[in-house]
Amino acid sequence: MHTQSFFSAAEEVMKRTIDRLKCELSSIRTGRVNSAAIETIKVESYGSIMPINQIASISVSDARTIEIRPWDVSQLSAIEKAILKADIGMSPANDGKLIRVSVPHLTQERRKEIAKSIGKMAEEFRVAIRNERRVLVENIKKLEKDKVITEDDKKKLEVEAQKVTDGYIKKIDDSIVVKEKEVMQV
């Protein structure tokens, strides 16, 4: 049946959307030091743009410090500039061999700003999921119009499409609640 391939394709897109959300959420800074916040910062290196984690090793040295050890020390200044340019509220210190990034405590005001931006991000991902549902429903309607399925089948499939969509929206909401709690935790 054609509908199964439509559902499979839609679910695959929805799964990738959830994966992207989780990736973006992991890069958001919480009260705890996490190297993921800087791993994906783009650095101009060797004539191309690369994430920091592809040109250096990144480790958390203590509760408030991340160390970046480039594999080529000539990249130190490029990495330092990229961190400053990213404007993520962290200050890099270059000692000639590695970069130490001091992670300041988040103020309550900054925590609220981050939580608000997480909410906006969540809505963008919900819209992406709903758009995929819309495409799925349009395909179902086209099958009915082409007399491949009956009107009853169409209605059942539309209900199923809504259930799938609701499941993925719930995954977004659950992920957001967890991340907002992490951010607001002092």
UniProtKB/Swiss-Prot annotation:
Top-level lineage group: Bacteria
Entry GO CC: cytoplasm
Listed Pfam families: RRF
Subcellular locations according to the entry: Cytoplasm
BP GO terms, sorted: translational termination
Entry keyword set: Cytoplasm, Protein biosynthesis
InterPro entries: Ribosome_recyc_fac (IPR002661), Ribosome_recyc_fac_dom (IPR023584), RRF_sf (IPR036191)
Signal peptide: none
UniProt xrefs under CDD domains: RRF
A GO term, aspect molecular function: ribosomal large subunit binding
Purpose: Responsible for the release of ribosomes from messenger RNA at the termination of protein biosynthesis. May increase the efficiency of translation by recycling ribosomes from one round of translation to another.
Family affiliation: Belongs to the RRF family.
Name of the protein this chain belongs to: Ribosome-recycling factor
Species of provenance: Endomicrobium trichonymphae
UniProt lineage: Bacteria, Pseudomonadati, Elusimicrobiota, Endomicrobiia, Endomicrobiales
Gene giving rise to this polypeptide: frr
